[in-house]
Amino acid sequence: MAKGAVTFDGELKIAAQKYCDDWLVFHDYEVHLYVNDHSPTADDTLADYVECALIGYAAQLLIRSGWSVADPLAHAVLIEQATPRRFFPLGITVPTLVYGYYVTDEAGALAWAEAFTLPQTIGVGQWIDVRAKIRYANCPAC
């Protein structure tokens, strides 16, 4: 009895490119910053994220044609936006910690999220660049 199936790297990249071509470039997604200390999980809902509420902050539309598919590395393929979205809120008086970003689809539903390795501080005259990405892998533990 087989313990599980694994896709070879070449096929994995083909599948990731197909996902990108058939789904990501045909749908609108928005990227949002979140300010609560939360590590994303597969069971998350929008209620798990507290969106940034700084004056001048707004979620940003991801560019449909901006996705690129990298070569496989460690049995995973990274699909990411080529150009980062820059968040530059106005009127900041107190530095704010930003823990990561989440992405919503056209219906406003949570699509995916990523926590930053370390929380980023946004203060007076500062901004945060976010390059949205999806890790397309053989298995969740890969």
Give the positions of each predicted feature.
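Small cysteine-rich, disulfide-bonded extracellular modules of the LU/uPAR three-finger superfamily
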Residues: 1-99, 105-142
